[in-house]
C-alpha cells in the first residue's frame, strides 16, 4: 500500500503585481514591474520565496500591466521542483479591464482569498517591497489581534498614515500639500499645529506604510 502525501493547510497571501511601474521606466516599457530583475531574480520571485519560506502556500497575484507575462511566469514557477514539492498554488486576479488600486484589488480578489469566509485571514505584500521582516512571526503575532495590521516605518516621505498613542490608525496626511484625511476632528486640529519635521506630535504619530499588511 502506497504512502499518501499530506500537505499543510492552505495559508493565503496576495502579491500586488498589477502596477504600471512608471518609476522603473524604461525597464517597464517591455515587461511588468513584477518581472524586473534584482540580484538575478524577478521582484516577484523574491517575494514568493519569502512567502513560501514563511509557510504561505496559496498565493493570489493580481495582474494588469503585461498580465500575460506574469501569468506565464506563475504557471512555470509552480512546476519547478522546489515549489512543486511544497504544493504551492498560484492563482490570478484579473484586472486587465481596470487597475483597481489597493482596496479595489483586494475586494476583486476576495473570493480567491477567503473562500467566501470573512473570518479567513490573509497577508498582502507589494511586489516591489524587499525586506528582512520575519513574515511568519508577523503572521503569528498579528493574527486575530485586529481587523487589519499594517507594517509601517519611521522614515521620511510625503504621505503618512496617522496613528494614536495605541497605534490605532486614525487618518492619513500628505505633508507636501498639507492635506489631512481623518474622521476625527481632533486629528485635524492637532496636526494642523504640527512642526514641519515632527513625526511624533502630542498624541499622534506619522508613519510610512511599508507595503505589507494582514487582513
Regions found by a protein language model. Give the residues of each.
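Conserved SAM/SAH-binding loop
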Residues: 20
Amino acid at each position: 500500500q502506497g504512502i499518501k502525501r499530506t500537505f499543510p493547510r492552505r495559508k493565503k497571501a496576495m502579491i500586488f503585481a498589477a502596477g504600471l511601474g512608471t518609476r522603473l521606466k524604461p525597464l517597464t516599457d517591455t515587461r511588468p514591474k513584477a518581472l524586473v530583475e534584482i540580484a538575478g531574480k524577478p521582484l516577484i520571485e523574491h517575494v514568493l520565496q519569502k512567502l513560501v519560506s514563511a509557510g504561505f502556500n496559496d498565493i493570489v497575484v493580481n495582474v494588469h500591466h503585461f498580465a500575460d507575462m506574469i501569468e506565464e511566469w506563475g504557471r512555470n514557477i509552480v512546476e519547478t521542483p522546489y515549489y512543486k514539492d511544497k504544493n504551492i498554488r498560484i492563482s490570478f486576479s484579473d484586472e486587465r479591464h481596470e487597475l483597481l488600486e489597493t482596496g479595489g484589488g483586494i475586494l476583486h480578489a476576495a473570493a480567491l482569498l477567503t473562500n467566501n469566509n470573512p473570518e479567513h485571514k490573509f497577508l498582502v505584500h507589494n511586489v516591489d517591497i524587499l525586506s528582512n521582516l520575519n513574515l511568519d512571526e508577523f503572521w503569528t503575532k498579528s493574527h486575530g489581534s485586529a481587523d487589519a495590521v499594517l507594517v509601517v516605518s519611521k522614515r521620511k516621505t510625503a504621505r503618512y498614515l496617522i496613528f494614536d498613542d495605541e497605534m490605532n490608525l486614525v487618518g492619513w496626511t500628505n505633508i507636501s500639500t498639507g492635506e489631512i484625511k481623518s474622521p476625527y476632528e481632533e486629528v485635524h486640529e492637532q496636526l494642523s499645529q504640527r512642526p514641519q519635521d515632527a513625526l511624533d506630535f502630542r498624541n499622534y504619530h506619522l508613519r510610512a506604510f511599508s507595503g505589507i499588511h494582514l487582513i
